[in-house]
Swiss-Prot record:
Pathway: Carbohydrate biosynthesis; gluconeogenesis; Carbohydrate degradation; glycolysis; D-glyceraldehyde 3-phosphate and glycerone phosphate from D-glucose: step 2/4. One of its GO terms (molecular function) is carbohydrate derivative binding. Its main location: cytoplasm. The lineage of its organism: Bacteria, Pseudomonadati, Pseudomonadota, Gammaproteobacteria, Alteromonadales. It comes from Pseudoalteromonas translucida (strain TAC 125). This is Glucose-6-phosphate isomerase. PROSITE patterns: P_GLUCOSE_ISOMERASE_1 (PS00765), P_GLUCOSE_ISOMERASE_2 (PS00174), P_GLUCOSE_ISOMERASE_3 (PS51463). The gene is pgi. Catalyzes the reversible isomerization of glucose-6-phosphate to fructose-6-phosphate.
Length: 548
């Protein structure tokens, strides 16, 4: 079985990488006045500029050839058609069906997926309108004021990120709170600020057995019953997103108040489903629907745009180029928009849980680096935290810079100041500052030659740091949908090019299984499993000191 590194296009790129490592972005721009127009493209609502990446025309041609040699178009068709491309779990991958605004029928395993999705969306809409209008009443006859979403991972990060993105645009109909951590501090801090009579809990767990989620759900219901006193009241204050009707019924949730999901939707791709219920409750169903519409627009672009202008594919190819060929093992996500402050954490899960694997489709260890470490924060805060390392560190970190043209809230000159930093940082990372420029600057400031000699080496910025810039028209619901879908399809393309199964997460399952065993040991001295000396020592220390 051959792996990707044996492809002709891969080997051509290896040679080009050796050559490109000797080139400087400053020189590439100087040689080509049309570089921006050649290496940028647009879709409605978004400009995508990758001209500050370390590529040239030859490299770009070779990257497109790699995509073709990996049959990216055929794999894309398989995904949209519902073929079971999640090969380790024998499942379709159909988060795109959740936002199929054309409502075209799609049959998978004898069921019309489109009809299932449309029915569930209608149920969500009805429920959301009932709660937001005040017609849904709690056990004491009062309407809902607060929503507490309890989930973890994909059941939490996506909805919370989208909610934060729309906070400045939403009304005050409902407050929403998110609980994901098994650390009791988080749920306790939420419960002390809400009223049991006016709170709705959304428990999101496909199996309704996820340890962290059910631990928090039990704490929530115990707290609720201290006030409500009657188990029958649970049905008016708890709803679920799950497929396990037996477990939800045991919990006290009416079947009518259980929203479903399907095994062809992975958690980290699920905010388009009923997992996004908290988004709709907070921002309104119309906003939730606009998120779906924005994502659908990108789905259509991804399906139909030529490979050379296909933004998700280009994003994936650049990531593979930077990671597997140029050797950059980290990537920063830097939104210059406070509304997108949770995007780095969301994409960290999306990319690293999807493509953080070391074997190919055939189970063979791959000889190249796969996914980079994804991290970041809002741009201005990052400038005063870690940009020093981006500019002068000896580890090069490619970065995605994201900003909006129109702010959600326009305050005096704030946005111009923000965007001036956005533009300046990518230019500085690309150009750097050389000895001649520094010497001229210090001389103009009246520094002596001795002072210049002392400072010179410390002030050199090599530049040549690759970045991509995305300019959004604005950050609204449709934009949020577009942006997330772009990265989702990037993840898919990256997985195909690297020959990685992007839709399982066996590393997550391993940790969950071990934690379950150790939990049993911590609560019952009679239970013993074999561990290494470090784990035994840590557990013994914990048990010795937890009651002191």
């Amino acid at each position: 079985m051959t792996n990707r590194s044996q492809l002709a296009s891969w080997q051509a790129l290896e040679k080009s990488a050796t050559k490109m490592k000797q080139s400087h972005l400053r020189d590439l721009f100087a040689k080509d006045d049309a570089r921006f127009s050649q290496f940028s493209t647009q879709i409605p609502g978004l400009l995508f500029d990758y001209s500050k990446q370390r590529i040239d025309k030859d490299v770009f041609t070779q990257l497109i050839a790699l995509a073709k040699e990996c049959d990216i178009s055929a794999w894309r068709e398989k995904m949209f058609n519902g073929e079971k491309i999640n090969i380790t779990e024998n499942r379709a991958v159909l988060h795109t069906a959740l936002r199929n605004r054309a409502h075209t029928p799609l049959i998978v395993d004898g069921e019309n997926v489109t009809e299932l999705v449309d029915n569930e969306l209608a149920k969500i809409k009805l429920f959301v309108e009932k709660v937001r209008s005040g017609k849904w009443l709690g056990y004491s006859g009062k309407p809902v004021k607060d929503v507490v979403s309890i989930g973890v991972g994909g059941s939490n990060l996506g909805p919370q990120m989208a909610t934060e993105a729309l906070k400045a645009l939403s009304d005050d109909t409902l407050n929403v709170h998110y609980v994901s951590n098994a650390d009791g501090v988080q749920i306790a801090s939420v419960l002390k600020n809400i009223d049991a009579e006016t709170t709705l809990f959304v428990i999101a767990s496909k199996t309704f057995t996820t340890s962290e989620t059910m631990t928090n759900a039990k704490t929530a219901v115990d707290w609720f019953l201290q006030t409500a006193k009657d188990n029958a009241a649970i049905a008016k204050h708890f709803v679920a997103v799950s497929t396990n009707l037996e477990k939800t019924a045991e919990f006290g949730i009416s079947n009518d108040n259980v929203f479903t999901m399907w095994d062809w939707v992975g958690g980290r791709f699920s905010l388009w489903s009923a997992i996004g219920l908290p988004i709709a409750l907070y921002a309104g169903y119309d906003a939730f629907e606009a998120i779906l519409e924005g994502a659908y627009e990108v789905d259509e672009h991804f399906k139909n745009a030529p490979l050379e202008q296909n933004i998700p594919l280009i994003m994936a190819l650049l990531s593979v180029w930077n990671t597997s060929f140029l050797g950059y093992t980290s990537q920063a996500i830097l939104p210059y928009d406070q509304a997108l402050h949770m995007l780095p954490a969301y994409l960290q899960q999306g990319e690293m849980e999807s493509n953080g694997k070391h074997v190919n489709f055939a189970g063979e260890t791959v000889p190249y680096t796969t996914v980079p470490i994804i991290w970041g924060m809002t741009g201005i805060n990052g400038q005063h935290a870690f940009y020093q390392c981006l500019h002068q560190g000896n580890v090069i970190v490619p970065a995605d810079f994201i900003a909006s043209i129109k702010p959600q809230v326009n305050v005096d000159k704030h946005h111009d100041i923000l965007l001036s930093n956005f533009f300046a940082q990518t230019e500085a990372l690309m150009n750097g500052v050389d000895e001649q420029e520094i010497t001229a600057d210090l001389t103009a400031k009246g520094k002596s030659q001795a002072q210049i000699d002392e400072l010179l080496k410390h002030k050199i910025h090599q530049g040549n740091r690759p970045t991509t810039s995305m300019l959004l028209d604005s950050v609204d619901a449709k934009t949020v949908g577009r942006l997330i879908a772009l990265y989702e399809h990037k993840i898919f393309c990256q997985g195909i090019i690297l020959e990685i199964c992007s839709f399982d997460q066996w590393g997550v399952e391993l940790g969950k299984g071990l934690a379950s065993k150790i939990e049993a040991e911590l609560v019952d001295e009679r239970v013993k499993y074999a561990h290494d000396s470090s784990t035994n020592g840590l557990m013994a220390y914990y048990k010795q000191h937890r009651t002191q």
